[in-house]
């Protein structure tokens, strides 16, 4: 008879958790940032608020966003006027949309990741699903299992209402699942749709308006497993360590509340300051075991909460401009997609590395960091190890 220790040993993987595939998806409806203020004030019947509209135009100009994708279009908003008011009961209408559309968009991203992975979906042992867009029972994890035709025995974890740091959280959880369950293949999906936060303008809460200028829809999926079978699986990044912390003196800096009016979003003015002041401590703790203290020697994936956060982090750490290039590119092409953003950036980085003929998946560098920032103020820090690019792939 096997001892507990022997059973335990047999359950564990040998090597680190590894990202084996990435897929992304957006709704088809694309809105350019230059046109958004006119569209937004017209659709919410707020054109009479001329000063506020000018203010919103300046917010959109400064956002460094070129375009965003949104499930909500003119037709849907015309049918749901309460969603266009600043504070009107509208949760039922919002829930009706997101309960269906969040798993659907997640399916699109997951299907791409599974296709890239190239293995039968019956080999997926775990599913981690994350969304800040609506809640339901059984959850979006259950709906996605059905939509994809995963095995009924797939082990599911549903994460609702985490917010913008959760792209780091899902990787931290997937790492623990993959490394503690030999042969596990974890499908991770983040799917976000702004139908839950969209609302008309008000001059009393400008932080709500900031959200309207930044948020976009998107879903991203990754497959994570340890001890990859390199004859059929292609490792992209290894997940070496992961940490979560609540920043000091940050109570109420970012929060959201699900109410009859939908998900309301609040943030204090100094969020970029709080993050940039504390980020070096997170980096130092994460990279001390590796003896790394030159932050420019790393490849960077940071949740692009907004341009001010990126600017202040860059300046505080003395980062070279190219360090946040992939991060800024995703912000400019998609806006802030909450938890899905960092996975989009991971995808962007490996693609750039392959197409640019780099020697590793991390822009030619060995070590990297992935940061999530969100409500709390909570910070997720994931240490990544890149993988050498096979010679045939880089040509």
UniProtKB/Swiss-Prot annotation:
- Pathway participation: Secondary metabolite biosynthesis; flavonoid biosynthesis
Instruction: Give a single Pfam family match.
Output: Chal_sti_synt_N
Induction, as annotated? By ozone.
**Keyword annotations:** Acyltransferase, Flavonoid biosynthesis, Transferase
Q: Which GO terms describe its molecular function?
A: naringenin-chalcone synthase activity
* EC numbers, comma separated: 2.3.1.74
- Catalysed reactions, as listed in the record: (E)-4-coumaroyl-CoA + 3 malonyl-CoA + 3 H(+) = 2',4,4',6'-tetrahydroxychalcone + 3 CO2 + 4 CoA
GO biological process terms, alphabetically, are:
flavonoid biosynthetic process; polyketide biosynthetic process
Q: Where is the active site?
A: 164
> Which intervals of the chain form a coiled coil?
none
Family named by the database record: Belongs to the thiolase-like superfamily. Chalcone/stilbene synthases family.
Job description of the protein? The primary product of this enzyme is 4,2',4',6'-tetrahydroxychalcone (also termed naringenin-chalcone or chalcone) which can under specific conditions spontaneously isomerize into naringenin.
Record protein name field: Chalcone synthase
Q: Can you name the source organism?
A: Betula pendula
Gene that encodes the chain: CHS
